[in-house]
Structure formats: C-alpha cells, structure tokens
C-alpha cells in the first residue's frame, strides 16, 4: 500500500476509539485522548499565546495519542503511519512514562493496536 493510500493516523485513531467504545463499555478500563494535536503548528500570535497558556495549564507536548488506565496501571499508545517516526517530544514522553512505571507502545495500524492492547490485557 502506498503511503498516500494508507489511512491517516487520525483515521486509525477514530476507528480504534469507535471499536474500543464498544468492547470496553462497562469493563473497568478508562481510556482517553490528550488534545495536544498540532502543538507545534501555532504560528500566529494568538496561537502562540493559546499554546503557552495550555502548557502553563499542564498540557504536555509529546503525550501519546491514547491513554489507558486499568487496575491502577497506566498504558500509553502512540499511533503512527507505516513509516511514521516519533517526534523528539514523543521520545522524551515515552522515556518519562516508562521511567514512571507505565507501559508504552508505538503501533502502526488498527490491527497492530488491537494486538498490543490484547497483549497488555486491556482487551481480550
């Protein structure tokens, strides 16, 4: 599949979230997304001011796309396209999350994400 015909990261995330809302309903797993998309894209004065305020409020650059909490343990899932690479901020966040005792994975497709979540025991 050519890169142009493969799904965007956002499309994979939407597909995964729709699926997880079905399979995790009432299962004692909390999952959510951190709204930090486009943090590096603020170019106008208003955008920079908003980004600065969000950072002061605790928004953290590089946070994984999906966060899961199950039985007191945190799991972070970063979604990428086939040849996608983590940003410097994402690599820093990954190291910090692992150092804090969380599990972290980078996945490259819907199926890859489902397999990782099964391996973690988030879904069966």
Regions found by a protein language model. Name each.
Residues 1-124:
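Catalytic phosphate/metal-binding cores of nucleic-acid and nucleotide-processing enzymes, i.e., regions
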